[in-house]
């Protein structure tokens, strides 16, 4: 991460706006953030994966800020824990961000993409858990990405998955109603989900149990074979005796 420019700044940059958020919005972020952190770490990518932290982008004006539900700062250590980020101090613009669309759809569909593009963000995904296939204005996934022509809308779908170029995997919508969540999928077509930490631990436990059972079966088979050979030897001795 670039060195921060330290200078005296009398402006107060709040850590929170003291406004509540919908529980579903929080639950989606709480599941997705550690998934992205573990996935990027597994690929050897150095990045800071955060959630709902203010990113200030205009020195001297604390109203100029954005707080993505989940975001990735490439090249920034995960070991850092800050109250807010200030882009003029060397913090890079987010490589990736996901915003859960709330009742304030105008803010999410119009304002956030405009700000994200203005500050140099690379990829923004809007996830709208309340979107319906019949909706013309809302979609389950809306993707904005920076390319040769600038920051533009590149995909809008009611499907259950979109490809994230920034992360190198798929984003998958799972569950229904209050159980709607966003997961990562890591195969070519987005079918294989990247496991949560609990799922990974359970898979390791199951694999260890399978290995233990296989070893026990092999031991029992070896003992049975040894017993059979000993019996044959004893039978031969008896016949010769």
PLM region spans:
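A generic secondary-structure signal marking the coil-to-beta-strand transition
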Residues: 28, 45-47, 68-69, 94
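A structured, charge-rich N-terminal accessory region that forms the first stable segment of a protein
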Residues: 21, 26-38, 48
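C-terminal interaction segment
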Residues: 2-21, 38, 55-68, 73-119, ...
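Short acidic/polar active-site loop segments enriched in Thr and Asp
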Residues: 122
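A short acidic/basic microdomain associated with nuclease active sites
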Residues: 44-56
């Amino acid at each position: 991460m670039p060195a921060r420019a330290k200078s005296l700044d009398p402006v107060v940059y709040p850590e929170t706006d003291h406004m509540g958020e919908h529980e579903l919005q929080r639950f989606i972020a709480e599941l997705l953030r550690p998934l992205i952190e573990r996935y990027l770490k597994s690929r050897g990518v150095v990045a800071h994966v955060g959630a709902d932290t203010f990113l200030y982008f205009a020195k001297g004006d604390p109203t100029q800020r954005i707080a993505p539900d989940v975001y990735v700062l490439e090249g920034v250590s995960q070991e850092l824990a800050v109250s807010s980020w200030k882009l003029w101090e060397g913090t890079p613009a987010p490589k990736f961000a996901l915003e859960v669309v709330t009742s304030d759809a105008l803010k999410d569909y119009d304002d956030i993409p405009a700000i994200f593009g203005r500050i140099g963000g690379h990829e923004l995904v809007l996830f709208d858990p309340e979107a319906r296939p019949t909706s013309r204005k809302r979609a389950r996934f809306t993707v904005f990405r920076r390319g040769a022509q600038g920051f533009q809308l590149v995909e809008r779908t009611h499907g259950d998955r979109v490809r994230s170029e920034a992360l190198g995997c798929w984003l998958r919508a799972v569950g229904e109603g209050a159980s709607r969540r966003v997961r990562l999928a890591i195969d070519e077509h987005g079918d294989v989900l990247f496991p949560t930490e609990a799922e990974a631990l359970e898979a390791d436990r199951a694999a260890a149990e399978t290995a233990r059972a296989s070893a026990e079966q092999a031991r029992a088979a070896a003992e049975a074979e040894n017993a059979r050979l000993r019996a044959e030897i004893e039978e031969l001795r008896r016949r010769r005796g």
